Amino acid sequence: MKVSAVETGEISQVSAPRKGMIRGLSIMDFILRIVAAIGTLGSALSTGTTRETLPFTTQFVKFRAVFDDLPTFVFFVTSNSIVCGYLVLSLALSFFHIIRRSSAAKSRILLVFLDTVMFGLLTTGAAAAGTIVYVSHYGNVNANWFPFCGQYNHFCERISGSLIGSFIAVVIFMIIILMSAVSISKH
């Protein structure tokens, strides 16, 4: 009488590394979501609180720069805030994937879909703000847009710095989406 592979335990030895890899991917996913949430929160707060008033004024005009003077920066702050909120809410599902490895394929597919949507939102916000920051640093002579970062140094430094956190979150989203796709393929 032959002994089957299930009775000898050979199948469980083959599937054990796969489960360990999926758990490792889930833990990495959780950590990356926290880092991306911190990056988007920092970008939104840094841009949302940026304002500078020049020390000289005229009788009727006060020279100031505030982030909401440009709709692009408003969109940047809004997109970073939405993505940060999503990342905080998705931490619960990511933690669920760490605890319960089985029957999580459907929720992983949902997360990949929502991650892709948030990736697009974050990328468009960061790219639009990056364009305005570039024009404010270097100007565009053909369109008669002159650089104003020579006058508003503090404003431009904070806006430029906030782009770093947002673009780091974009890269992290790419990694999260790829890791989720690998994890789904292993199920």
Swiss-Prot record:
Location(s), subcellular: Cell membrane
Protein's membrane topology: Multi-pass membrane protein
Coiled-coil segments on the chain, per record: none
All ranges on the Extracellular side of the membrane: 46-72, 130-163
Keywords in alphabetical order: Cell membrane, Membrane, Transmembrane, Transmembrane helix
Ranges per topology, Cytoplasmic: 1-24, 94-108, 185-187
InterPro entries: CASP/CASPL (IPR006459), CASP_dom (IPR006702), CASPL (IPR044173)
Any one GO cellular component localisation term in the record: plasma membrane
Major subcellular site: membrane
Superkingdom of the organism of origin: Eukaryota
Disulfide bridge map: none
Ranges that cross the membrane: 25-45, 73-93, 109-129, 164-184
Oligomer status and interactors: Homodimer and heterodimers.
NCBIfam families: A_tha_TIGR01569
Family, similarity comment: Belongs to the Casparian strip membrane proteins (CASP) family.
Name of the protein described by the UniProt record: CASP-like protein 2
